[in-house]
Amino acid sequence: MIDKIKIRGARVHNLKNVNVGVPLNTITAIAGVSGSGKSSLALGVLYAEGSRRYLEALSTYTRRRMTQAAKAQVDEVLYVPAALALHQRPGVPGIRSTFGTGTELLNSLRLMFSRLASHRCPNGHYVPPTLAVAAEQQLTCPECGARFWPPGAEELAFNSQGACRTCDGTGLVRNVDLATLVPDESLTIDEGAVAPWNTLMWSLMTDVCRAMGVRTNVPFRDLTPEEKEIVYHGPAEKKHIFYKAKSSNQAGELDFTYYNAVYTVQNALAKVKDEKGMKRVEKFLKQETCPDCGGSRLSDAARAPRLRGIGLDEACRMTLTELTGWVNGVPGTLPPEMRPMAASICESFQTAAKRLMDLGLGYLTLDRASSTLSTGERQRMQLARAVRNRTTGVLYVLDEPSIGLHPSNIVGLTGVMHDLVADGNSVVLVDHDTQILKEAGWLIEMGPEAGAKGGQVIAEGTIAEIMQNKNSKIGPFLKAESSVIRKQATAEEMFDAGRIHLETGAIHTVKPLAVDIPKGRLTVVTGVSGSGKTTLILESLVPGLTAATSGQKLPEHVLNVQADGIRSVKLIDATPIGINVRSTVATYANVHDELRKIFARTEDAKTLGFKAGDFSYNTGKLRCPTCDGTGVINLDVQFLPDVEIPCPDCRGSRYDKDAAKVKYPAANGQYCSLPDLMDMDISTALTACADLKTVRQRLQVLKDLGLGYLTLGEETPSLSGGEAQRLKLASEMGKSQSDAVFIFDEPTIGLHPLDVRTLLDVFQRLIDSGATVIVIEHDLDVIRNADYIIDMGPGGGNKGGTVVACGTPAQIKAAPASVTGKFI
């Protein structure tokens, strides 16, 4: 009986000829410090080989139309099933995607409204539910005798025939924002008070406006309401004006039609042909809910069918939990002959909905735009879609499924994983969360360190065996809850350095709130998924503080922000740095420019005639001509995926062989070239550059941030979310930050419990330099180390959106209403 996948000689990324067995039909966890090779083993070997072999069974013609993974660098992988991967960061969907379309729940709901609802005849009467709809027959109205075709499921889709004609199925319209048309009312119209006339229209519109009876030589605020109405909405009348050009002394008479300020913007919007033109216009626009469909995206005809007294638009506005209860009652309201069909449609809806509710997404409404969902919510949608089909014999590879999950939601996630195994599948997950790791039947730990010092299996076995293994780094964290490692402020001294006060109106699911955040402290915002953490901090506090510090108008829903002494807001999120391979750790950390100058001053460079600019791998003379300084070349192979290989000439160094002739006497006694330095990790380069003050200081900051394992030449787009966040912080360390607020969005993504301790040290150093640090987080180690906690909830969606408790970790633990408190 084959009971495990056998991997022999895996060399993907930093894996060092790894030989390991991965048990089938169980949950296998892969743990290890950041950069130790976990994802390389799970995604780079298991998923790459599992999906590639499945696709190779298809015809060449079919494969041509699919993106394919290249063959993994491994000697052999035996007994690997067809594989599906759920990536750490699902792509952000477009404007047309909603929670309903993304989960495909809307398909079942549209079918329900098409087949089971009461349909409206052309004269406005409703026909009782009938099987004639499913039989694709015309309906006859019992009141007026009109015959008509009922709408099919496709005619109820807002991305198809059921789209609202006004907003084209997006639920949003762009309208002119009157507040932007005259930004400074102290100016006269002659001085350019009406902004769109300055940028989108001929300057002579001022003369036409004068001919309309508006005084153009007094401050705009002093105009009468009638005059202002003419400026904003005046009629398109033709006026005879005397016009004098500003640039010359030429003058003349002409007839010209008046374009009011609003029409000027509308006219310019209609004529936009490119992005540049759109940029000129969009500053005068604001997005608003469509007045015709009320944001439901559906046409009047698509909103017409009635089931249990409501339309499709109203059903989509319910939360998933409410909607499930409503769907349960549908068959009972129909004639007996329709109930078997109704039960079948409703069951398909309930099966899909149950998975999503198990994963803690019951608070979301079907009409919620997918682009407003958090990473964790999108990942759980992806997981629910993958497990819905009750397949067997599939390998599911999950990359950090605990991202964005509150400890209380993890129970539902582990339940889904056990269901997959019960159906005869195998689950491999990469994670750091000890709560999830404890659910695994087998654990493989990678290490011992990160980067070049990692890539080996340092421990494997059951959870009990790992706990006893002296080589294991995760073992101690599986055994016991980790302790508090920083000195926390007491409740009495919490606000000694001052406070930031925020008041907001209702937005999304968040009710009107008033919160105080202590300055110079570590504040952690907690709460179950969907409780309003992101809305409170990223959509209210960040734009509110930014507006307050720059003297701009507060966003509409932000009622009040008081932040005395705060001058800058720094959002450190996990978005990748750069989009192309030309951005490296050395260029981003401002080390590369310094190194180029140093190498240009060497005797070798002077002899060969090289200047600092020549050492640039992007534009310099010394860049490799074969790969143009990227270090890789793409091979376009017909019928196969593009193959990206290290450049055969420079072997990935990005430099021509002449660059190796310029040597610098390093502090460790060796002579090294710039390509040699770029190939070193930060810790090694620190030793080599010990006598270069500026370079040493910048590299030391990166090492202190726990990034010593990254090589200087590593591409920044390939860094994990946690690495990207810490690299962005590098330029902020060491400065006085008493006027700064740092906001982190789940910074522990991808961090091992040991790395979380490094992160807490980083927070402490920022606080020691005077900064206020605010963190949105689910990680219990970070929560336990907070000075102040703002716990949102109590539930998600409509059941959340309020502040349940505020205070020290001890006060939150004692708060009966706090779900987070139960886990501290």
Language-model features and meaning:
Residues 1-824:
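Conserved phosphate-binding elements of NTP-dependent enzyme cores
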